Amino acid sequence: MCILILCGPQADPAQFLPVMLPECAGRALRTVVCTDVDSLIAALQAAGGDAEVELVLLDSGDLSPSAHVHAKALRAALDALPTPYIELHTDGAQELEPWLHPQHAPLAVVITPHDAPRAYAMSLGIAAHCLPSLCAPLRAAA
C-alpha cells in the first residue's frame, strides 16, 4: 500500500525531498513528477487503476492559464479517482477548485505560502490521521 505524491508542472520536488520520510502511516511514499498538464492527467488516471495507491497528495504546481484548456480532462481524472486526495499548494492562486469544480472534492486543501516543506508535512499528517494504521495493535497477555 502507498501514498502517491503527484508533483505538477513547476512543482519543485527538490524543495521537499530532503525532509521526506520513506513512509507515512505504514505506507510507502511514491513520487511522480509531471512536466506538463497532460502528464499530470495521465498520472491521475494511472493512480486510479493502481490498487496499491490508497491516497494521493496532489501538488498541481503552478499551472499556467493555458492549463484551463485541459479543465474537462483534469476534472474527469480527479472525479474518476477512487481514492481520497489532498491538494497542497504554496500559493492560494494555485488551488484547483475555484476554476475546476471537481465533483470528487479533495479530503483537504493545504496552502502554506512559500513553504513547501510545511505543506508536505501537514498533508502527510492529515494522511496519517485519515488512513487506518497498518501496524498490528499491541496486545497485553492475559
Locate predicted features.
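Extreme N-terminal starter segment of soluble prokaryotic enzymes
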Residues: 1-4
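Structural motif
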Residues: 6-10, 35, 59-62
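Short, glycine-/small-residue-rich phosphate/pyrophosphate-handling segment
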Residues: 8-22, 94-142
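A generic structural motif
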Residues: 24-31, 53-54
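A short beta-strand-loop structural module common to alpha/beta enzyme folds
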Residues: 28-40
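TIR-domain catalytic/interaction hotspot
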Residues: 40-49, 75
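Short acidic/histidine-rich motifs immediately flanking catalytic phosphotransfer sites
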Residues: 48-58
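Mid-chain, well-packed structural core segment of small domains
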Residues: 61-101
